[in-house]
Regions:
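Patatin-like phospholipase
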Residues: 1-20, 28-190
Length: 190
């Protein structure tokens, strides 16, 4: 957000945005027309602890569940799947994360990303093939979620039969994606 503030201060035009991971979140919010002040309010009100938490805040738990805090280290998804033991796909499923991402997206519903106020692309990684997946359309919140799914921490996002994780694995700085969008000058932020 800080870089965007400086670009606005010096009136540097932003013709397109390509983002990965946290860059996909900030990029999508800005590309969809959210002002930096609006972003600051939403991002400032987010507790990182709650963002990546799957259970309600402690004060909302019954006394019995509160005592579990002292006896249970974590509660991963464990179960049987076709007779085989299966484990969760990440420490968190990303449900809370998706809620916040929907707040950060001014564009609701399905979009061609070239039709946003600023053309936008997000990069995720196909967990099966190991290749980059560049999103040119979709629901912004879902696309941001896929691009931010850190393997092992947040469960992969499922899209069109693919399991997608954080784009940083294949395109930490999606400069080539920005060039393919027509950018002559690229300002890359890591």
């Amino acid at each position: 957000v800080g870089v965007l503030k400086v670009l606005e201060e010096y009136r540097v035009p932003v013709d397109c945005i390509a983002g990965t991971s946290m860059g996909s979140l900030v990029g999508a919010a800005y590309a969809s027309g959210m002002t930096l002040d609006e972003m600051d309010v939403i991002l400032g009100s987010i507790s990182t602890e709650l963002l990546f938490r799957e259970t309600p805040p402690r004060q909302e738990l019954a006394l019995r569940r509160k005592t579990d805090d002292y006896t249970i280290l974590s509660t991963p998804e464990v179960g049987l799947d076709n007779g085989s033991l299966s484990f969760g796909k990440g420490i968190v499923t990303g449900v809370q994360l998706e809620t916040v991402l929907r707040q950060l997206s001014k564009a609701k519903g399905f979009y061609e990303f070239d039709e946003l106020p600023i053309p936008y692309r997000a990069v995720a990684t196909d967990l099966v093939t190991g290749k980059a997946v560049v999103f040119k359309e979709g629901e912004l919140a879902n696309v941001m979620r896929a691009s931010m799914s850190v393997p092992g921490a947040v469960a992969p996002a499922e899209f069109d039969g693919m399991l997608l994780v954080d784009g940083m694995l294949t395109s930490n700085l999606p400069v080539q994606t920005a060039r393919e969008m027509g950018a002559d000058v690229v300002i890359a932020v890591n």
